[in-house]
């Protein structure tokens, strides 16, 4: 195979970090393979099918890789009231609120299923109009619902659960996928594989000039928050979370020098000033202190005047780390407190004590933190 088209399926506008790392991984190993990234989130709904068709017609890919990030309906973010309506429908004491919530819920269900149908239509478009192209699909949403979605995708489409670097490389080279987390439908038969060794993160960095050349829409993210990954995996066992299933429970760390190199490239070449660590948790535990500390120290040493954030367990913040976080430019933080009851937290296997969470917030305040701690 000589060409790959990556298609980031529609979701809220968020920097498509996954496909950028995939493209860079392949480029470093197969520099002769042509690649292109298409972000469908940046097109109006009515133009997305044409965008896929035009990109495939112009680029003539041998392999089309779809990245499906979001599928959930209850998204507790600004502008999405699904969760509020669900609570009103089940628990509101006012009957009128329940009636209103029921109609709103039907509308949201319609939008939800319409979104799924639309996302599925793009692989089908490729299968029908460009039948010689091999289709692959992955991402968080697909990984979570792979058994259901593979039934609705074109036969022969290769689904990847979790990480896709090694799987894509093997498809390009014509190797077997038996040691990868793949799923494939052939008629009524479903084939699956199990991953052997996960991808090596020490080689995972971004050649930004190359990325800029294969991602024409990058300008839409100038001034936006840019995703950077410092580690993969999550050691916790929260009852509602899929990160350990998607990335594994063993935490794998990128060298701090490479993490900050990513930040520095975007800072100097794209003018980026806001960054989001896409890790399941930036501080996964005490064993993460050396890496986190070195990353923040390197940001300071390189005089990168940025604002950064990510998912943070404030229960793991020490007074020393809090000072370093503030000095290096930490912005608003999202903290998954979930409940103010320790009993509930224990039942959900959250793995932290409320007292320690409060301590971390206090350390940040004492260090001069001026941002917001957003509880969810």
Where are these regions (language model features)?
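Radical SAM [4Fe-4S] cluster-binding motif and immediate context
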Residues: 202-371
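Conserved beta-strand segments of the P-loop GTPase G domain that flank and frequently precede/overlap
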Residues: 66-67, 374-376
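Structural motif
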Residues: 136-140, 311, 374
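Acidic, low-complexity intrinsically disordered segments
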Residues: 1-262, 267-271
């Amino acid at each position: 195979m000589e060409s790959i088209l990556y298609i980031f399926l529609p979701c809220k506008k968020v920097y498509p970090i996954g496909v950028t790392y995939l493209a860079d991984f392949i480029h470093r190993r197969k520099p002769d393979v042509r690649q292109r990234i298409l972000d469908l989130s940046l097109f109006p709904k009515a133009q997305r099918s044409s965008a896929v068709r035009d990109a495939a017609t112009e680029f003539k890919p041998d392999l089309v890789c779809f990245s499906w990030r979001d599928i959930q309906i209850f998204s507790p973010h600004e502008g999405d009231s699904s969760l509020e309506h669900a609570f009103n429908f089940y628990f509101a004491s006012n009957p009128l609120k329940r009636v209103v919530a029921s109609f709103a819920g039907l509308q949201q269900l319609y939008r939800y299923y319409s979104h799924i149908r639309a996302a599925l239509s793009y692989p089908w478009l490729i299968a029908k109009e460009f039948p010689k192209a091999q289709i692959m699909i992955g991402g968080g949403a697909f990984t979570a619902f792979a058994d259901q979605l593979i039934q609705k995708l074109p036969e022969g489409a290769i689904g990847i659960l979790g990480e896709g670097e090694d799987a894509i490389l093997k498809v390009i080279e014509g190797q077997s996928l038996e040691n990868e987390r793949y799923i494939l439908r052939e008629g009524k038969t479903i084939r699956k594989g199990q991953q052997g060794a996960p991808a090596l993160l020490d080689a995972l960095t971004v050649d930004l000039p190359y990325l800029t050349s294969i991602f024409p829409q990058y300008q839409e993210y100038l001034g936006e928050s840019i995703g950077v990954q410092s580690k993969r995996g999550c050691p916790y066992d929260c009852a509602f979370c899929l990160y350990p299933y998607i990335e594994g429970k063993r935490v794998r760390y990128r060298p701090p020098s490479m993490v900050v190199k990513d930040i520095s490239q975007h800072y100097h070449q794209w003018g980026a000033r806001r960054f989001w660590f896409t890790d399941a948790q930036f501080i996964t535990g005490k064993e993460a202190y050396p890496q986190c500390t070195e990353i923040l120290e390197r940001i300071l040493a390189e005089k990168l005047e940025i604002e950064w954030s990510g998912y943070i367990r404030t229960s793991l913040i020490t007074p020393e780390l809090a000072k370093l976080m503030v000095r290096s430019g930490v912005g608003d933080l999202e903290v998954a407190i979930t409940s103010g009851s320790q009993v509930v937290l224990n039942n959900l296997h959250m793995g932290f004590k409320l007292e320690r969470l409060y301590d971390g917030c206090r350390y940040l305040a004492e260090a001069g933190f001026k941002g917001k701690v957003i509880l969810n």
